[in-house]
Amino acid sequence: ISDNGCGKFNDLTASVLKSIWQKGATHVWFTGVIRHATKTDYSAHGIPVNHPAIVKGNAGSPYAITDYYDVDPDLAEDVDSRMAEFEALVARAHKARLGVIIDFVPNHVARQYVSLCKPKGVRDLGADDNQSQGFNPQNNFYYCPGCSFEPYLDLYAGTAEPYHEEPAKATGNDHFDHKPGQNDWYETVKLNYGVDYYAGGIGYFNPIPDTWFKMRDILLFWAS
């Protein structure tokens, strides 16, 4: 980010938003809002550092979410006030008579997903999973029991310690073994909504899988 810079929430001023509305737009679609994996170090602000081996590029993929309840610090002028800056942007957009759309990524998350900003009482994705089972309808992820994550790439990525994950989790593009290839979404983990892909896609929806409730709560958080 020090080399290339990044647009900020605050850059979309009232006058900019008004000009968008005057061109006939009814909504603005802000992409990359939810916090995702990056190689930029924000540990001074209490944000965990992501292992570089599982971040694509330096800025990371905006679809490798690390916290569904947070916004991306790259987009804030004051990192510690990042959510307030986003909320102020939404308010400016509404005042300019524009609806607001953001990306919701329901299929997968980053490999080091940990929510710092989740509301009280909310359990993290994967926190209660039975990792000894490749598939369990109440798990949030899919696992490769007994196998560590062994992608095609160097898991050190210039660091002293390699990235380690055991059991390995399935990728967001449905690679269900522990050795994703160059064309796989190796930096992501697929979410389990109760479909057993190991058995040909059989669905288990009664009782309702836990992931559905967690994702419902995330949607309600943003809709509010």
Q: Model-predicted segments: where are they?
A:
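Short, intrinsically disordered, charge-balanced linker/junction segments flanking boundaries
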Residues: 220-224
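N-terminal structural segment of carbohydrate-active enzymes
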Residues: 1-99, 107-109, 114-117, 129, ...
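Acidic, His- and aromatic-enriched active-site or binding-groove loops in soluble protein domains
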Residues: 54, 117-176
